[in-house]
């Protein structure tokens, strides 16, 4: 059965034929962040794929991760293409390096997952929160239920983590 829902007025549909994403969003629907772990080399991977990008082995299992990490990079959207996002501009899309598997299998490798910046209750972040988050900010995952058995993973500032004094942000022109 496909996973269907609605996120900010947009229809979300993950068909069973897309086994990897169906499983990923199904775990998110249980409010668990899980990633694939290769049955051969043992390395974890995200986003979900049909084979390990490190050794090409196809078999994997889904393992839980902490859901905590550091902003590795970000994009700040000021002119939304999707009409539904216009009322939320500026908003951020964060690329977060998870705490697990840093610098593996080689230096500068890691588990990195993209998602929007949100408030702790799963709403898109207001402009004042967007302006405070930059590279180095510590975040944790939150889930926004969008349908039966499906949730959208989002990032929010981890209030329990030590934060950088001034996270790096792109210079304002």
Please annotate each region the language model reported:
Residues 1-34, 133, 147:
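A broadly conserved sequence feature marking short terminus-proximal activation segments
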Residues 31-34, 48, 65-67, 132:
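Short metal-coordination and nucleic-acid-contact micro-motifs, chiefly zinc-binding Cys/His arrays
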Residues 69-72, 138:
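Conserved hydrophobic positions within beta-strands
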Residues 101, 110-173:
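Well-ordered alpha/beta subsegment
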């Amino acid at each position: 059965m496909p996973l269907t829902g609605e996120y900010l007025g947009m229809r979300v549909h993950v068909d069973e034929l897309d086994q990897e994403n169906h499983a990923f969003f199904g775990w998110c629907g249980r409010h668990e962040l899980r990633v694939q772990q290769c049955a051969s080399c043992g390395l974890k991977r995200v986003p979900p794929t049909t084979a390990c990008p490190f050794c090409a082995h196809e078999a994997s299992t889904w393992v839980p991760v902490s859901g905590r990490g550091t902003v590795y990079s970000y994009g700040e959207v000021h002119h939304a293409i999707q009409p539904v996002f216009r009322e939320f501009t500026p908003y951020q899309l964060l690329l977060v390096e998870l705490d697990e598997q840093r610098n593996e299998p080689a230096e500068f490798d890691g588990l990195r997952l993209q998602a929007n910046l949100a408030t702790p209750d799963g709403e898109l972040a207001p402009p004042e929160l967007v302006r405070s988050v930059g590279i180095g900010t510590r975040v944790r995952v939150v889930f926004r239920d969008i349908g039966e058995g499906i949730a959208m993973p989002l990032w929010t500032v981890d209030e329990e983590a030590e934060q950088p004094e001034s996270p790096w942000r792109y210079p304002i022109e």
